[in-house]
Each structure stands twice: as structure tokens, then as C-alpha cells.
């Protein structure tokens, strides 16, 4: 059984026992349980239910493993030709690591 769930504006395929890295969830504590009820699709033993826009009564229950995980560094380089202007910026996106405990449909 799996579900397509929307978390922080992104869609994920969720199955029980799976780990997900989603964009940082504000005020999240390690070990806390979070429920997401914006389920767009549920596949239960080959029986597919598509929501319009969401499936009623369906939810995905997750446990927060780590509330703050930093992604790989992305380097942004700006240069203006012939002027000697160079600028290098770095950015590391913050993520939250979740473990899906169950999919309720």
C-alpha cells in the first residue's frame, strides 16, 4: 500500500517504513509524530483511489527522525566580463528527515 502525499508544497510517494527528506518543517522536534492529511492518491492492493483534490479520511503518519539536516552545498558564481567583478555565494538547504510509520486510507 502506498500513497501520494503533499508535504510543504512537494509531492512524495509514501510507503510504510520509508525515509523521506522534505523541506524544513518549522517547530519540529526529534521523535515527534506528524500527520499529513493532504493525500492525493491511495493504492491499496491494486485498488487505486484518486482524490478530487484529496482523498477523504486518508492520512500519512510520520515520525521525525531529525528536525534539521543540511543538504549539499550549492555554489553560485557571478562574474561580469572585463570588469574584474567576481562574487561567489554558497547555500545549503535545510531539510527534515521523516520515517513513515503508516498510511491510513
From Swiss-Prot:
<dbReference type="GO" id="GO:0006412">
    <property type="term" value="P:translation"/>
</dbReference>
<comment type="function">
    <text>This protein binds to 23S rRNA in the presence of protein L20.</text>
</comment>
<dbReference type="InterPro" id="IPR036164">
    <property type="entry name" value="bL21-like_sf"/>
</dbReference>
<comment type="subunit">
    <text>Part of the 50S ribosomal subunit. Contacts protein L20.</text>
</comment>
<dbReference type="GO" id="GO:0005840">
    <property type="term" value="C:ribosome"/>
</dbReference>
<dbReference type="GO" id="GO:0005737">
    <property type="term" value="C:cytoplasm"/>
</dbReference>
<keyword id="KW-0694">RNA-binding</keyword>
<comment type="similarity">
    <text>Belongs to the bacterial ribosomal protein bL21 family.</text>
</comment>
<dbReference type="Pfam" id="PF00829">
    <property type="entry name" value="Ribosomal_L21p"/>
</dbReference>
<dbReference type="InterPro" id="IPR001787">
    <property type="entry name" value="Ribosomal_bL21"/>
</dbReference>
<keyword id="KW-0687">Ribonucleoprotein</keyword>
<keyword id="KW-0689">Ribosomal protein</keyword>
<dbReference type="GO" id="GO:1990904">
    <property type="term" value="C:ribonucleoprotein complex"/>
</dbReference>
<dbReference type="GO" id="GO:0003735">
    <property type="term" value="F:structural constituent of ribosome"/>
</dbReference>
<protein>
    <recommendedName>
        <fullName>Large ribosomal subunit protein bL21</fullName>
    </recommendedName>
</protein>
<keyword id="KW-0699">rRNA-binding</keyword>
<dbReference type="GO" id="GO:0019843">
    <property type="term" value="F:rRNA binding"/>
</dbReference>
<dbReference type="InterPro" id="IPR028909">
    <property type="entry name" value="bL21-like"/>
</dbReference>
